[in-house]
A protein has these predicted regions:
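Hydrophobic alpha-helical transmembrane segments of integral membrane proteins
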Residues: 3, 44-45
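Sec/Tat signal peptide C-region and signal peptidase I cleavage site
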Residues: 17-21
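Structural detector for internal amphipathic alpha-helices that build alpha-solenoid repeat scaffolds
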Residues: 22-28, 46-60, 79-101, 122-150, ...
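Bacterial N-terminal signal peptides that target proteins for export
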Residues: 1-7
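Bacterial N-terminal signal peptides
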Residues: 7-15
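Short inter-helical turns and helix N-cap capping residues of alpha-solenoid HEAT/ARM repeat scaffolds
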Residues: 43-44, 75, 84, 115, ...
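Amphipathic alpha-helical scaffolding segments comprising HEAT/armadillo-like alpha-solenoid repeats
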Residues: 26-38, 60-77, 100-123, 148-161, ...
Length: 291
């Protein structure tokens, strides 16, 4: 066999080996994917939640239909683990991350179903032995509808949620409109802020308005003013909002807030958002920023 033939044979063998190795990797990934889908459909609650979380990070649109099926839960057994708000929360995030247009109708339908059971006085439970409550799940659904490709139906569903009796659902609807990022929703957002009484929801609505406009106008300074609110939860949310819109004008308000903020969780969030606005990581040992 000539040297040239040996060289060609070696190249072909090398390429074949590489292709074979890649095929094996793809097969393993496919098997892992289907294992997670199986757990999503028939595992215990913890396995279902972990599977939905895994599928969120894989972000494969192959998972959209299995996730939508799991989102519906078990309509015949209301207290079934399949209807867990924590599971619905995680599935909503996964579907939002996949940004598939076919997810919209199912997510909107499920939001309408569960939000009908959320009352005006219900409070979002971020941590409890049972996990998240229905308020959190409803909010996460409508928030993530805003991440999907635009449709008139999706936008109308989010706008309608802006009038929900519960403040957290209204705030989540504002987040959904922020995610949708369409200037034609500004009139409804401006109308909503004029009649909103709840400070947390006000911050979310202002956040959406400023995010869409990207202008340091009066609405932006109204948002910054909530960094002085009596409620730590509102101050925390306001800090996230100011950091998220990423306008340099927010630096002064965040620095002023940090000088007087005593709540540890809020302080840490302000530090993160200030670093985001100023474009660098603040030293942990700087006297001004120590607890």
């Amino acid at each position: 066999m000539s040297t040239l033939r040996i060289l060609v044979f070696g190249i072909i063998l090398s390429l074949t080996t590489q292709i074979s190795a890649k095929e094996m990797i793809y097969e393993k990934l496919d098997q892992l994917f289907y294992d997670q889908v199986e757990k999503l459909q028939s595992g215990n609650l913890e396995e279902r939640i972990q599977a939905a979380d895994y599928l969120k990070f894989v972000s494969s649109k192959l998972a959209v239909r299995p996730l939508l099926k799991a989102l519906k839960g078990n309509v015949n057994v209301p207290k079934s683990e399949e209807n867990s708000p924590t599971l619905k929360f995680t599935i909503a995030q996964a579907l939002g991350a996949m940004e598939s247009d076919i997810a919209g109708p199912g997510m909107v339908e499920e939001f309408k179903k569960i939000s009908a059971n959320v009352q005006e006085g219900d409070y979002p439970a971020f941590s409890s032995p049972e996990g998240y409550n229905l308020v959190i799940a409803a909010g996460e659904l409508i928030r993530n509808v805003g991440l999907l490709p635009y449709t008139k139906e999706n936008q109308e569903a989010i706008l309608n949620a802006l009038n929900h009796p519960n403040f957290y659902v209204r705030a989540s609807a504002a987040d959904g409109l922020k995610n949708l990022n369409r200037k034609d929703t500004l009139s409804q957002l401006n109308s909503a802020i004029d009649k909103e009484k709840n400070s947390f929801a006000k911050v979310a609505i202002l956040n959406a308005i400023v995010y869409i406009n990207r202008i340091a106008n009066q609405k932006f300074y109204d948002l910054c003013a909530f960094l002085k609110d009596e409620s730590p939860m509102v101050r925390y949310r306001a800090s996230i909002a100011v950091g998220e819109v990423d306008l340099k004008a927010g630096e002064y308000s965040l620095r002023e807030a940090l000088l007087v903020e005593h709540d540890k969780m809020v302080r840490e969030q302000i530090k993160k958002d200030l670093a985001s606005v100023t474009g660098f990581k603040m030293p942990a040992n700087t006297i001004l920023f120590t607890d």
